[in-house]
Amino acid sequence: VISHHFETPWTEHAFLEPECAVAFYDEDGDVFIYSTDQSAHQTLHECSLVLGTDKVKVQNALVGGGFGGKEDMTVQHLAALLTYVTKKPVKVKLTRAESLLVHPKRHPFYMDMTMGCDEHGNIMGVKATVFSDTGAYASLGGPVLERACTHAAGPYHYENFEIEGTAYYTNNPPAGAFRGFGVTQTCFATETLLNMMADKVGITPWEIRYRNAIRPGEVLPNGQIVDESTGLIETLEAVKEDYEAALAEGKPVGIGCAMKNAGVGVGIPDTGRVKLIVED
């Protein structure tokens, strides 16, 4: 059994194109917003609330890089409000320094994890407590934490997994969406713990992953049944020779495995209801 504490920091998205919005009144008398954000429908909703009218239109234009960093509203409401008040076209664009200050970053995580294995390196169970700093505003702190916990067990086959996650409001800068969506942080902790366990058991990091790798038809610790498209075993086998050769040459080589969701489903129960009326 091995226990360890892990911490990960804020991370900047570093997209090339800073946030920008252009607003004006169109021929229908609506406030029309060209926006470089990743969430046009949310921008429409929030700008409508700001202006107190549903006569608002939003169109994405020249978004450029985002990586999750442009999912939150930054300048769109400012351009819209100024147009609403002045009746003139308005453009609001952040400088690089302003962009770095304003948009949410990757969540800092604080994680305590315990992993147990048998003498052969087969994972018997993992228990974890995870805290994330979502800053002064929630942003996507809830969904990020949900993903972080759902995938923290890794792409491995074992049954005993317990994790508790909490996102906290703090007086720090807001944190939100970023590529990996929380999985990056917990994956780092799980994979590091697995390396520590391999060293304790006396096998290579490759071997402990191969012994525990999920295979089609097996059930992940989060309850998901793995389908035939899963190729973790084949992937590990494909890199084995090069990995071992690099180790033999004393090269600083590492290995890690991870899984991440595609889509937005989180296994919410799919319930149905029917109403029966009995008539004489």
Where are the predicted features?
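Structural alpha/beta core scaffold segments of enzyme domains
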Residues: 1-280
